[in-house]
Every structure is written in C-alpha cells, then in structure tokens.
UniProtKB/Swiss-Prot annotation:
The gene is metG. Residues 580-681 form the tRNA-binding domain. Is required not only for elongation of protein synthesis but also for the initiation of all mRNA translation through initiator tRNA(fMet) aminoacylation. It comes from Hahella chejuensis (strain KCTC 2396). This is Methionine--tRNA ligase. Keywords: Aminoacyl-tRNA synthetase, ATP-binding, Cytoplasm, Ligase, Metal-binding, Nucleotide-binding, Protein biosynthesis, RNA-binding, tRNA-binding, Zinc. InterPro entries: aa-tRNA-synth_I_CS, Anticodon_Met, Met-tRNA-synth_bsu_C, Met-tRNA_ligase_1, Met-tRNA_synth, Methionyl/Leucyl_tRNA_Synth, MetRS_core, MetRS_Zn. It is found in: Cytoplasm. Its main location: cytoplasm. One of its GO terms (molecular function) is ATP binding. ATP binds at K335. Belongs to the class-I aminoacyl-tRNA synthetase family. MetG type 1 subfamily. Residues 555-569 have a biased composition (Basic and acidic residues). Binds 1 zinc ion per subunit. Zn(2+) binds at C146, C149, C159, C162.
Length: 681
C-alpha cells in the first residue's frame, strides 16, 4: 500500500426495529463488512457505523399488540439484531438506535436550519382517518377489495394479485387494517421540505460520480419529471421525535432515519479520542463518506438526504452504493408470503461464512439482483473453500509437523510465490471497486495453481523415498506460503477462517505492506478450519423456513389462488428431436443499453453484446423491469433466430425469460464468470 492512510466513514441502511433480520437484509451488511474489513486490512482508518431505525407507526402498533411500550420493543429488537449481526461476523464500530438524544438533537438542528433557510412549507392536507383508533392511516394500513380484479384483502394503494395501482378512495369496502373501522377523511396541517428548490443542485450532484450509472439514469427520469415537496411530518399518536415548537406533530421516520448515521457516529466519537465528528461531517471535510443501501431506498439517500445536508451546511456523501435484492432459487423474496429465510434460522443450521463467501462470489458493483441458488451454494462452497482453499493447508501441514513443525529455511519456488504476490494489486482494486466476484474468481484461480503444484510434486510419494525429507519440507513449505497469501486475500470475506489460519501459521494476517514469505518459521498444529456444507442441513433449514411460512397469514383472494393454480398447470410442450434442439444457438449476452419504446406498452429495446457483435432485440419485459436495472446484466439470447421486422425497428434475436407475464417475469441470468458470446450448451 502506498500513500497516507485514508479516513473513511461507512454506513449500511438502518434495519427497521420491528422484526428480525433475514437473508435479504444480510446481503447489504455482508457486502459492507467485506469492504470495511478490506480497508482496515490495507491500513486505512475506516469506521463502520449503523443503528436500528426505531420510529414510526408500525413500531407503535406492534408494541401495543404485544402489550409493551415502544421503547421495550426497540430495545428487544436491538439486542436481537446485534446478536444476529455478530454471529454473521458483521463488525460494526458502533451499532446504535435512532431513538437517541444525539439523533433528537441533530434532527432538530437540521430541521431548524432548513426552516431558517425558508425551505419548509406548511399546508393543510386531507387523509384517511381511523375514527376508532383516532389516528391517520397510511395507505398500507388500509385494506379492502381491489377495484380492478375484485381480489379481497388488498392494500390501499396497490393490488398484489393484478398489480394495479389506485387511491384508497377507489378501494371497495375499505377498512382500517388496525381496527377494522371504515376510514373517514380528515384534514391536518403538515410540514413539507421544499425539494424542488434543490433541483439544480441535485442535477449536478447526481452526475458527479457519487452514484452508479444505472441509479443516476433513474434519478434523471425523476428530475426531468419535476420534483415534489416532501411531507416530513406525521400527526400524533406517533412514536418518534416531536417537531420543535409544534405540539402533536412529529418528524416522519424517513427524516430522522438517515440522520441516525450522524447520531451513531457522534455517539462513537464521545468514546473514541481518535475520532472527531466535525472532521467527518463539516462542509469542507476531506474524509470519505460512503452509504451502502438497497436500490429501493435510493430516492431518500440520493435526493432528500443530500439536499437536507446541503441546506444545513453539512457535507454530502462521497458516494452512495446501491445493491439489488436477494432471490432464493430464482424466486423473489416476499415478507407477505413468508418466502424468506431468517438469519436466526440459517445460523441454527449452517456456518455463516458459507453465506459470506457465496454472496461475495456473486457480488458486483452494479444493482443486479443476486440469486441464492441453494444447490449451487452447496456445490460452490464445498468445491472452493473445502476442496481448494483449506485443502492446500491440510495437505501440507502433516508433513511439516512430522518434520518438526518448522518451515523450510529457503523458498524452493520463488517464481511461483511471486506469481501469487503479483496479483495483490489486481485483487485489491477489485475489492476497492466492490467487484467482489472478480476478486474471488482470481483468488480461486490461484488456489487451483497451488493445488496443481502440490499434485505435481506429490509430497506423499516423496515421503516414501529415503533421503527426500528436505524436498518434502520444501514443497510443503511452499504450499503453506501459498495458502497464507490466499487467506490474506480472502480475509475480508472469511474473517473466522482467517483467524484460524493466523493461529495455524503462527503469524498475523496483514495486507498493508508487502508480504514476505515465511522461512525457518514454526507453525502450530493444523486444526480443521471449515467443514463441508451438509445438504441435509440445507434441507433442514428450508424445512424450518417452511414452518415459518405456514404460520404466516393466508391470502384470502380467490384471484391470487387462481393465478397460482394457472402457473402450476402449464403443460410441458410436445417432445422434439435432439437435432431440432441442436439447431438453436443460445448465447450469453450482456445488456449494453435498455430503453422504453415509444408507443409500445410491453416492449423494451435492448442492445446486446454477444462478443463478436452487438444485436438489437425488442423484449416484452417492460412490466417487470425498469430499463436502468438491466444495463450491465448478463442474460441468454437465441442468437440464430431469423430477424423480425417490427414497426419499431428490426429485432435480431430473442432473450429468454420465465413466468406467466405481468410483473411475474424473470429474465434468465447466468452465474458470474460467464462471458458475452459464450455458447449455452
């Protein structure tokens, strides 16, 4: 590493304090933790803070249902979150709560700064109101019959069966999801942040390199359409911070939630003499500030948040990094249907480092969704971590122990060692760029070389020959040094295995200076570092999750039931000859660009890179995908389909997708490692 150590502050989005962590949440915290551990391993002062998002109507109502106070609920959830994160080896420098005095003070300060700057408006609005509970109802707290498909028990703003959107007033037989009462309309005075006043600032900021291209393009659409004022207030009863000088009015949870990043850091600064709040948050700060978030909350972090910070004379983020969602075996996760695996359920059955590695192997810097394919998960972890990585150390250690437990005084293969060390900068840059999958592929390619070297030298055969003791020690000492380099590169991903490796190697894992090979160095007895994934344990985890799903509320909408039955009854097509199938040329394609087609309700225009050329394809996937979410993705296309002339242009192939249509369309996506132009066989 060269240059002065960087000062970096990193955050992950705040998990909501009304329930447990699940695998969909964990993608973000694992991604962030790997990046932070990498920065620390490289010698930088990198600080990682987070907190529970602990305000809002949902928390107030859940506490009431449980017969406890909101404070008791958020304390209980906070303890559960801390426990689960710790067991997944997520190492926060501070994990706090938005329900804190630091956050109250900072939220009030920022609000008053915006008020003094003339950026807060006041006006009267009409909302749905529960006359029994005496509270205003957000759309999600109103249920009724869909006005389009007549499915029952649908939310106040959208139908989960037919995907229609509407207003609560259009809902048939609306009722409060809290009390069952019929809502009435009632007026209230609300406070609004004048976001349109920051249009010019945001147009520049969102194009300044702070966002991924796909995200910047999406925000450009919103900016071009014109920004609306943002309602930052809620009426009592509400669990949160009361707005200064406005009795009965509270800050909307999304106002004080991101300020929770600042509050958590301020709380840490009070306990750490080496950290200064202003050094990281003042307007002219030279420290780096990064937010890792899900793509679904980008509007709060890339529009509202930088605008409020700028208005209150604080610095804005160096970058906001968004990621996609987690799917399991190709299906979208859904809380309402219970199709997710809880963090605690996973931990009861499997090693957390399995998931850390699998996520890392598939993570890129873009916003594509990540699929947790459980069969691939088992095969990949067993092949890479057990069959390749740890196998190197276990194959060599017993011979070194037999020779006295000390490595050879010389390195017999300096060129091979140098080949491994020469990849340091490439792998480090991949981590820096959040291209974890690229880093993992390079590391595993090196692991293959290390195992090939040991196979060719066959120390187990040499050990049977008289007078070959030194050669055996030389070979195995090279193997152990290669393992040390590999585990150094993987330490951000596998901190537990790295710690066990450091114990075996009798040397710390360091990556902030050139690695010198270990020679004439005593190592400790080798102990198993990670075991194979047991498919039965995976099955047991899935079964336990199914038990959780069975306890979830059942859907009463006949339309949804009919829809599911229709999916399952789709018949297999008639049998064809193999020669007929062989005529189809399927290729890996990279989506270079994607855009709406004027005048087409269902089509997106895709520009596809298939290695030797680019093709234009019109795909009927508009109902399921936003164009900006597709750019950079790999998919599969029929490359030898006769071009079809359409009124919008020539379509030069077909991309492959699954699903019945509407929002239920899933574009095929190959595993990481596939390259544009590769033939699918």
């Amino acid at each position: 590493m060269s240059g002065e150590p960087r000062k970096i502050l990193v955050t992950s989005a705040l998990p909501y304090a009304n329930g447990p962590i699940h695998l969909g949440h964990l993608l973000e915290y694992i991604q962030t933790d790997i990046w932070v551990r990498f920065q620390k391993l490289r010698g930088h002062q990198c600080t990682y803070v987070c907190a529970d998002d602990a305000h809002g109507t949902a928390i107030m109502l859940k506490a009431e249902q449980m017969g406890i106070t909101p404070e008791q609920l958020i304390d209980q959830v906070n303890a559960d979150h801390r426990r689960d994160f710790a067991e997944f080896l997520i190492e926060f420098d501070n994990y706090y709560s938005t329900h804190s005095e630091e956050n109250r003070e900072l939220s009030s300060y920022i609000y008053k700064a915006c008020l003094d700057a003339g950026k807060i408006a006041t006006r009267t609005i009409t909302q749905a109101y529960d006359p029994e509970k005496n509270l205003f109802l957000a759309d999600r707290f109103i249920k009724g019959t869909c006005p389009k498909c007549k499915a029952e028990d649908q939310y106040g703003d959208n139908c989960e069966v037919c995907s229609s959107t509407y207003t609560p007033a259009e809902l048939i037989n609306p009722r409060s999801a809290i009390s069952g009462a019929t809502p009435i309309e009632k007026e209230s005075t609300h406070f609004f942040f004048k976001l349109p006043d920051f249009q010019e600032f945001l147009q520049k900021w969102t194009r300044s390199g702070t966002l991924q291209p796909q995200i910047a393009n999406k925000l450009a659409e919103w900016l071009d359409a014109g920004l609306q004022e943002w309602d930052i207030s809620r009426d009592a009863p509400y669990f949160g911070f009361e707005i200064p000088d406005q009795p009965g009015k509270f800050f909307y949870v999304w106002l004080d939630a991101p300020i929770g990043y600042m509050a958590s850091f301020k709380n840490l600064c009070a306990r750490r003499a080496d950290l200064d709040f202003d050094e990281y948050w003042k307007k002219d700060s030279t420290a780096e500030l990064y937010h890792f978030i899900g793509k679904d909350i980008i509007n709060f972090h890339a529009l509202f948040w930088p605008s409020m910070l700028s208005c209150a004379d604080f610095r804005t983020p160096s970058a906001v990094y968004a990621h996609g969602f987690v799917t399991v075996d190709g299906a979208k996760m859904s809380k309402s249907r219970g199709t997710f695996i809880m963090a605690r359920t996973y931990l009861e059955h499997l090693n957390p480092e399995y998931l850390r590695y699998y996520f890392a192997a598939k993570l890129t810097s873009n916003v594509d969704d990540l699929d947790l394919n459980l069969q691939d998960f088992t095969l990949k972890v067993n092949a890479d971590l057990v069959g390749k990585l740890v196998n190197i150390a276990s194959r060599c250690a017993k011979f070194i122990t037999k020779a006295g437990g000390k490595l050879s005084p010389q390195i017999s293969e300096p060129e091979l060692i140098e080949q491994f060390l020469s990849k340091s900068d490439f792998i480090a840059q991949a981590y820096e760029d959040r291209e974890f999958g690229k880093a993992v592929r390079e590391i595993m390619a090196l692991a293959d070389l290390a195992n090939k070297y040991i196979d060719e030298k066959a120390p187990w055969k040499l050990a049977k020959e008289e007078g070959k003791e030194q050669e055996v020690l030389d070979v195995c000492s090279v193997g152990v040094n290669l393992f040390r380099i590999l585990i150094t590169y993987l330490a951000p991903v596998l901190p537990g295995v790295a710690a066990a490796s450091a114990e075996f190697l009798n040397a710390p894992i360091v990556w902030n200076r050139p690695l010198e090979p270990l020679t004439d160095h005593a190592v400790n007895e080798f102990k198993p570092m990670i075991s194979r994934v047991d498919p039965k344990a995976v099955d047991a985890m899935v079964d336990a999750s199914k038990d959780n799903m069975a306890q979830a509320p059942k859907d009463n909408g006949k339309a949804k039931k009919d829809k599911k039955e229709a999916k399952s009854e789709e018949e297999i097509a008639p049998t064809i000859k193999f020669d007929d199938f062989a005529k189809i040329d399927l290729r890996i394609a990279k989506i270079v660009s994607a855009e709406h087609v004027e005048g087409a309700d269902k089509l997106l225009r895709l520009q596809l890179d298939i290695g030797s050329e680019q093709r234009q394809v019109f795909a009927g996937i508009k109902s399921a995908y936003a164009p900006e979410d597709l750019v950079g993705r790999l998919t599969v296309m029929v490359a030898n389909l006769e071009p079809r002339k359409m009124k919008f242009g020539m379509s030069e192939g077909m991309v492959l997708a699954a699903g019945p249509g509407g929002k239920d369309i899933w574009l095929l996506q190959p595993d990481s490692g596939a390259q544009p132009g590769m033939q699918v066989k």
